[in-house]
UniProtKB/Swiss-Prot annotation:
Secretion signal span: none
Family note: To FlaG in other Vibrio species.
Gene behind the chain: flaG
Renumbered residue ranges of the record's region Disordered: 1-49
Protein name: Protein FlaG
Polar residues bias spans: 1-18
């Protein structure tokens, strides 16, 4: 009794030519994927550095704008008060950076009220000096 064979020609599993071809392609694929990963990482770092630099520059510009706007406002308030003949002075304390309002008597020049008062400004100046020395 003859048994019919329904199977195809059986090839040995893992022939050398197939393995060699696959491993050569695998090495090339790995190298190109590593290079792509390195390129992506470098691009990401460059974008992050650019973002940080832009944020720092923007913060510095805003700080300059705030200082100039505040100085302009102090000048405008002083002009307005002098135009209505009231003795009131606005200034920015240099050491503490705080805005100061001084109300004084026109005839004598005596200070009636200062906001914040001189003692508080002195405390703020000392704290600022301590911070700078630390």
């Amino acid at each position: 009794m003859e048994i019919p064979s329904y199977t195809s020609n059986i090839q040995p599993y893992g022939s050398q030519s197939g393995i060699k071809f696959a491993s050569e392609n695998d090495g090339a694929t790995r190298a190109s994927s590593k290079q792509n990963e390195v390129n992506r990482t470098e691009q990401l770092r460059n974008r992050q550095n650019q973002s940080v630099e832009a944020a720092i520059e923007l913060a510095q510009q805003r700080e300059q704008i705030n200082k100039s706007e505040r100085a302009k406002m102090v000048e405008q308030m002083n002009e307005f008060i002098s135009s209505i003949n009231k003795d009131l002075a606005f200034r920015v304390d240099e050491e503490s950076g705080r805005d100061v309002v001084t109300i004084y008597e026109a005839s004598t020049g005596d200070i009636i009220r200062q906001i914040p008062n001189e003692e508080m400004l002195e405390v703020l100046r000392r704290l600022a000096r301590q911070k700078d020395h630390s």
